[in-house]
Amino acid sequence: MKIQCDVCEKAPATVICCADEAALCPQCDIEIHAANKLASKHQRLHLNSLSTKFPRCDICQEKAAFIFCVEDRALLCRDCDESIHVANSRSANHQRFLATGIKVALTSTICSKEIEKNQPEPSNNQQKANQIPAKSTSQQQQQPSSATPLPWAVDDFFHFSDIESTDKKGQLDLGAGELDWFSDMGFFGDQINDKALPAAEVPELSVSHLGHVHSYKPMKSNVSHKKPRFETRYDDDDEEHFIVPDLG
């Protein structure tokens, strides 16, 4: 006995989908579950067909049984099923299933092989493109994080030292030219002698010169720095105001 596909209703079903609750043939299974990633994660169980010979009926032991009763836990043929479950209303409520002789696989399988066959293999150019970022990341890890100092000076490379030296010479020449008109006017003529003392030196005085120098003594001021005292004088008339009268 075979189960018909619930989608095309033509080919025999080989897979039962637990999420869709449908029996599917191989072609319909690929078309439905390869549509998107969510459908590809559905749990499917394979249907393994047993031998074409059905077991015998547990009641008559003569005819092939294809009905299973859950409450009676027995395989029944069509005649025995009618005689038992149609007799009264209580037995008519028993749960009975069709025993097709097909066994469901214990482990869930996903039709990954069929999907991989339909997908094209990546070309060599794509494989090379995937390998290039891995190499670039490894090169970045090998590079040191801190910048290494340069073996040559920046000033020597750009010749800043030569520029500074020429600027200093130009400034000195320009300064000397500006001071020429001071010498022409006689500012630096006789006023500055060769024997003039530097500004930082203090002239030394001989003992004879010290005699003429009058010693300076600070004059004492007659004004005293003491605080003035205020004296209070009481007259004889004022003493009467401080006498307490005797009331006794």
From Swiss-Prot:
SMART domains: BBOX (SM00336)
CC annotations in GO: nucleus
Cross-referenced Gene3D superfamilies: Classic Zinc Finger
Predominant subcellular localization, coarse grouping: nucleus
InterPro entries in the cross-refs: B-box_zinc_finger, CONSTANS-like_Bbox1, Znf_B-box
Positions with biased composition (Polar residues): 120-130
Phenotype seen when the gene is deleted: No visible phenotype under normal growth conditions, but mutant seedlings show reduction of hypocotyls length when grown under continuous blue light and a short primary root phenotype under UV-B radiation.
Residues holding Zn(2+) 2: 57, 60, 80, 85
Residue pairs linked by disulfide bridges in the UniProt entry: none
Pfam families: zf-B_box
Stated induction or repression of this protein's expression: Circadian regulation with a peak before dawn.
Binding residues annotated for Zn(2+) 1, in chain numbering: 5, 8, 28, 33
Renumbered zinc finger spans (B box-type): 5-47, 57-99
Any one GO biological process: photoperiodism, flowering
Residue ranges of the region described as Disordered: 115-148
Record's keyword annotation contains Cell membrane: no
Example of a GO MF term: DNA binding
Segments carrying motif Nuclear localization signal: 226-229
Effect recorded for residue 226 to N: Prevents nuclear import
UniProt cross-references to PANTHER family, sorted A to Z: B-BOX ZINC FINGER PROTEIN 22, B-BOX ZINC FINGER PROTEIN 24
Function of the molecule: Acts as a negative regulator of seedling photomorphogenesis and light-regulated inhibition of hypocotyl elongation. BBX24/STO and BBX25/STH function as transcriptional corepressors of HY5 activity, leading to the down-regulation of BBX22 expression. BBX24/STO acts additively with BBX25/STH during de-etiolation and the hypocotyl shade avoidance response. Functions as a negative regulator of photomorphogenic UV-B responses by interacting with both COP1 and HY5. May act as a transcription factor in the salt-stress response.
Other remarks in the entry: BBX24/STO expression is not changed in plants treated with increasing salt concentrations.
Name of this chain's protein: B-box zinc finger protein 24
Organism: Arabidopsis thaliana
Gene: BBX24
